């Protein structure tokens, strides 16, 4: 069964991070520039949460706030479930589905952030794994 470390090996473990006092407007510009849907928010260079496109929609647009005078720290999501590189892809899918979230922070044994995985990463890995199984079964059937 595939684990998060397989996802991180494929896509890399680099994360895009901003300090908590960064304006939401600058966070959005960074997300657009990097073509990503979430950004890690830090305080004193330590992880404190994520800002996502959903946070922007719910906490800025729907609340009538302005992205140029609101900080990332004002709208972060801080209570996300944590996973490790050894967490299974199936478990990540379950956590994301049950929590209705699209991103999970990955922490190592020293509680250091070592990556972010998205629902797209999980779906890609699941499809790739199923394709491998189908190819193996196909080879087995044609070998007999």
Describe each region flagged by the PLM.
Residues 17-35, 42, 82-100, 107, ...:
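The conserved cystathionine-beta-synthase
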Residues 23, 48, 81, 111, ...:
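Glycine-/small-residue-rich active-site loops that bind phosphorylated ligands and cofactors
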Residues 1-13, 52-82, 88-97, 119-144:
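Tandem CBS (Bateman) regulatory domains
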Residues 15-16, 38-39, 48, 73, ...:
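Structural motif
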Residues 31-34, 39-55, 96, 104-120:
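A glycine-centered beta-loop-beta connector
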């Amino acid at each position: 069964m595939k684990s998060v470390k397989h996802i991180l090996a494929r896509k890399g473990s680099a994360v895009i991070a901003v300090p908590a006092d960064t304006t939401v407007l600058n966070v959005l510009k960074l997300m657009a520039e990097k073509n990503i849907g979430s950004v890690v928010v830090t305080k004193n260079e330590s992880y404190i949460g994520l800002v996502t496109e959903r946070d922007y929609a719910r906490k800025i647009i729907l609340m009538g706030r302005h992205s140029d005078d609101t900080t990332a720290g004002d709208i972060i999501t801080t209570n996300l479930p944590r996973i490790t590189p050894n967490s299974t892809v199936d478990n990540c899918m379950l956590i994301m589905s049950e929590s209705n979230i699209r991103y999970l922070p990955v922490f190592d044994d020293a509680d250091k952030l070592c990556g972010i995985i998205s629902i797209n990463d999980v779906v890609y890995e699941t499809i790739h794994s199923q394709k491998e199984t189908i190819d193996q079964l196909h080879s087995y059937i044609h070998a007999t």
